[in-house]
Amino acid sequence: MAQAARLSLRMQKELKLLLSDPPHGASFPHLSSAANGSGDFSTFSTIDAQIEGPEDTVYANGIFNLKIQIPERYPFQPPIVSFATPIYHPNIDNSGRICLDILNLPPKGAWQPSLNISTVLTSMRLLLSEPNPDDGLMCEVSREYKYNRQTFDYKAREMTEKYAKVKADGCSTSLQIKNHGDEKSGESGNSVKLKLTVESSLSIAHTVKRETAGRDEQEDGNGKRKAVVGFGEGNSFGNDGIKRSRKKLSLALPSQSQKKDLCGEEELTRGVSAACKENKKPNLNGKKLSLGLKQPCNDTLASFRTSAAKSDNNRLSRKLSLRSPLGELNEVSKPEVLAQTDMKLEMNQNEDARSLRGEFENSVLEETSMAESIVVLDSDDSGQEEEERVSSSRSRLSLAKRRVLKCRP
């Protein structure tokens, strides 16, 4: 009896406070009508409240109905609060139950007798603006809120638009919890329609993709067309009339590019390097080039040899024509003279060959003078050998002259 009296006094104070200084964004339509009719506040065991969705959230411009039940041991027990309007929230389930620490007793909750209904409604609006997905009632919604925020925002706005929007005449479209089953069935019907539209759009995209793929396969089957036309475009039209284009780039390697790696060696054997003309470094593969031409080019040496042989024949014919007075000599001295002339011709041929070889070496060195080419100079021994050959040839010439002078009468 004493507990009921204390509860009546407490409720009268709180309800008057709610009417005089309501929380921000909260209203009590039934409570205000009872106050105008001078009703008894002590008989209120259930309070119907309305809260507005916080601004800059997915629940903005929405009005949500709440049902507040006052227990007999209030304020030592927290009030029982539930949402009568469907809402998409991690901490509020489909039946309207709320997961909030202020609505539970310690040690799990944080309710205290010093708190009141105004504090509870303020905490509700704070929960709408800042959900707690780590302690949620709806696991799927909590997962969407954490990892797929865009999908969560879309669904929350859609449900707010459907159930919590205010009509033009000022009446709210939110329904009570008793009609929640019908609303759920209507929501499921809309979800089915949404799925059908999504599937139809996917099928259209799939058919368009298949058409473009078949067109690309036909173009790939014709090899000549792919080699000539390197950039193709396939256009297709969907059911919505939007033109979709798919561009394709095909690269064909020409046969001439496969022979570029061998251009250095082929041009080097011909005497002229194409890489030098294009200011490129030839790929010599570490081969050494010596002044003695240890690895001469076959074509160039053959040409020089033929030219040297022709010049030697011409010189031999000229010398023989000039040596015609030797016929007046004795028959015994003719073989000696011929031997001497043969020796001189051999020496001249050697000197001509050396001069031609030096000219060829100089030309090759001028063409292949690069940073990567390695020139190996002949040692001093080769120079000494050349000097010995020259001295020996000179001594032979002097001996031949002496013999000729002796043979003359």
UniProtKB/Swiss-Prot annotation:
The active site is at residue 99. GO terms for molecular function: ATP binding; ubiquitin conjugating enzyme activity. SMART domains: UBCc (SM00212). It is an enzyme of class 2 (transferase). The keyword Nucleotide-binding applies. Keywords: ATP-binding, Nucleotide-binding, Transferase, Ubl conjugation pathway. The keyword Cell cycle does not apply. Its EC number is 2.3.2.23. Residues 6-165 form the UBC core domain. It catalyses: S-ubiquitinyl-[E1 ubiquitin-activating enzyme]-L-cysteine + [E2 ubiquitin-conjugating enzyme]-L-cysteine = [E1 ubiquitin-activating enzyme]-L-cysteine + S-ubiquitinyl-[E2 ubiquitin-conjugating enzyme]-L-cysteine. Pathway: Protein modification; protein ubiquitination. Residues 378-388 have a biased composition (Acidic residues). Residues 207-232, 373-395 are annotated as: Disordered. GO terms for biological process: protein ubiquitination. Accepts the ubiquitin from the E1 complex and catalyzes its covalent attachment to other proteins. Belongs to the ubiquitin-conjugating enzyme family. This is Probable ubiquitin-conjugating enzyme E2 37. It comes from Arabidopsis thaliana. The lineage of its organism: Eukaryota, Viridiplantae, Streptophyta, Embryophyta, Tracheophyta. The gene is UBC37.
